[in-house]
């Protein structure tokens, strides 16, 4: 179960509503309870739902950071286009079939081959959830192997998300370096509430931010203040 907990590093530090927080906590509890009691197929279903939540949060970040690209990605979503454009929560994406929503990952350069691999996880979930007389995950070893596969996929999607996170962080630095003009005078508060909470950032997202190369902003008139803001993020969140 220790390896399974790694998925938590790809889920947001905090959520915009108590309902979202409660939902994620419920899924973790369902996974842990079923895993501990040997109900591995049900544990897999909960873990899959946590994984799809990660995907929804990734797509949400694309929507927020690159709205133009997101709109282009809506081609073929005629029935759901309005709802997706006006979405106020990542979970609005759940109205679209999981296999279909994965197409948005093309916006972060995931090719058809990779998306096909990710879609296989959805197929596995469907087979496990239907009353077909089969127990696909009857042993801990079987589920652990599937968790390893899922985490590889999640890590791969995270790697593809790096340009989106870097873009989001760059904009944050440019727009929030002045303590007199931002919402919170203290840099740590601004980072926590506006960058991390406001963008559903995860531990792995913040790891990307902490490695951001400030050289691309060296000519900016406020590079010193930008550097200070970045240093606070590194000091508060950098690991390893």
Where do the model's predicted regions map?
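Short flexible/disordered coil segments
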Residues: 125-135, 193-201, 231-240
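Acidic, Ser/Thr-rich low-complexity intrinsically disordered segments
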Residues: 172-230
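A mid-sequence interfacial segment
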Residues: 92-107, 206-217
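Acidic-enriched, low-complexity/disordered segments with a strong bias for Aspartate over Glutamate
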Residues: 2, 29, 69, 80, ...
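Amphipathic alpha-helical interface elements
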Residues: 1-101, 117-120, 152, 159-181, ...
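Charge-enriched, short contiguous segments at helix-coil
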Residues: 18, 104-168
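Detector for Asparagine
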Residues: 9, 34, 58, 112, ...
């Amino acid at each position: 179960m220790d390896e399974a907990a790694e998925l938590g590093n790809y889920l947001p530090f905090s959520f915009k509503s108590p309902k979202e927080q409660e939902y994620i906590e419920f899924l973790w509890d369902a996974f842990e309870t079923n895993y501990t009691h040997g109900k591995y197929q049900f544990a897999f279903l909960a873990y899959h739902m946590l994984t799809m939540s990660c995907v929804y949060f990734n797509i949400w970040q694309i929507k927020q950071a690159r709205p133009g690209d997101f709109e282009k990605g809506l081609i073929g979503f005629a029935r759901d286009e309005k709802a997706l454009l006006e979405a106020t929560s990542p979970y609005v994406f759940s109205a679209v079939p999981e296999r279909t929503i994965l197409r948005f990952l093309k916006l972060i350069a995931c090719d058809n081959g990779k998306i096909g691999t990710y879609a296989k996880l959805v197929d596995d979930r469907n087979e496990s959830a239907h009353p077909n007389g089969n127990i696909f995950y009857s042993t801990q070893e079987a589920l652990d192997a599937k968790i390893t596969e899922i985490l590889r996929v999640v890590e791969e999607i995270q790697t593809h998300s790096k340009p989106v996170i870097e873009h989001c962080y760059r904009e944050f630095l440019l727009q929030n370096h002045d303590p007199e003009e931002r919402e919170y005078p203290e840099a740590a508060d601004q980072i926590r509430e506006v960058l991390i909470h406001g963008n559903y950032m995860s531990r792995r997202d913040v790891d990307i931010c902490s490695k951001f190369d400030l050289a691309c902003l060296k000519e900016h008139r406020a590079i010193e203040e930008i550097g200070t803001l970045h240093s606070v993020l590194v000091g508060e969140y950098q690991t390893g």
